[in-house]
Amino acid sequence: MMLILIAVGIALAVSILLTPALIRLFTKQGLGHEIREDGPPSHAKKRGTPSMGGVAILAGIWAGYLGSHLVGMAMGGDGPSASGLLVLGLATVLGGVGFIDDMIKLKRARNLGLNKTAKTVGQLFAAVLFGVLALQFRNGDGLTPGSAELSYVREIATVTLAPALFVLFCVVVVSAWSNAVNFTDGLDGLAAGAMAMVTAAYVLITFWQYRNACATAPGLGCYNVRDPLDLALVAAATAGACVGFLWWNAAPAKIFMGDTGSLALGGIIAGISVTSRTEILAVVLGALFVAEVTSVVVQILAFRTTGRRVFRMAPFHHHFELVGWAETQVIIRFWLLTAIACGLGVALFYGEWLTAVGA
């Protein structure tokens, strides 16, 4: 537990201190955000706000993760694990794709970065690499970071994927989550605040998996997860970095995370869900992100098939703005919904464990 607190503290400190430095740097260089040309009129005042704050988030996550491990190793503990490094590697590669996208937007002074093909290729590369490596690095207990068995709160033994199908599954999961967080990042602090809650929930889940791991505490309800404590450190560092960034990103935002941050954070959810064997449970925890990306899909399908739009604008947080909700109302209400979803997800996780142990 001490290492988890250290990861949170370091990540928060790095993020909250580095972000204002980025604000000054990007402002001096004139690297301001361009808004959607068809976006809500109230967003016009956001033009010119520095972007690419995801650099501070990623720096905070890595600092929190590595810093907690330095302390742990000084006390005789283990170093970074394959699972933790795979998740952070996935997030970093996706963040790199987002960084290129952000830079192109800023250079062109338009809200148009990488074309869809280039962006998809970048996400595909990250997902395939993650999927292939997730089935490697078998430890002494025979566990790999990922599992070919589909998982709810633990592996579903009746649904086993061939290695190639598992990699394809990872492509779907990574693409879905990275795009979901990307679409959610449209209001000041919305994505950062929601992400902090989801990863905080994952701290509880993965730490519980660590305390009830089959490798150290075999018995009813134990979990076959390769590196649950390390995943808790990744989740804790992410939560801390998001809170630190939120200090500057809360309405009215002084900086935006950009695709650098949103794609990376989507990678965090995707990576942790796969390596903690909770791919289906993640849909409950990240219900806001799921709803946001679903609204975009529904809007596109409805318009192409009927010529009519379901929402005034998608992602649907903009719909609520256009029907009269203030931006801060949308943000706070969506945060509340995220808190409820995370509470429900943790309750489902714990309830399944109680059932497994016969309580």
Swiss-Prot record:
GO cellular component: plasma membrane
Keyword terms of this UniProt record: Cell cycle, Cell division, Cell membrane, Cell shape, Cell wall biogenesis/degradation, Magnesium, Membrane, Metal-binding, Peptidoglycan synthesis, Transferase, Transmembrane, Transmembrane helix
Compartments, record wording: Cell membrane
Principal EC category: transferase
Main location: membrane
The keyword Electron transport is assigned to this record: no
EC number of the protein: 2.7.8.13
Membrane topology recorded in Swiss-Prot or TrEMBL: Multi-pass membrane protein
UniProt xrefs under InterPro entries: Glycosyl_transferase_4, PNAcMuramoyl-5peptid_Trfase, PNAcMuramoyl-5peptid_Trfase_CS
Named cofactor requirement(s): Mg(2+)
HAMAP family: MraY (MF_00038)
Protein's name according to its UniProt entry: Phospho-N-acetylmuramoyl-pentapeptide-transferase
Record organism: Mycolicibacterium smegmatis (strain ATCC 700084 / mc(2)155)
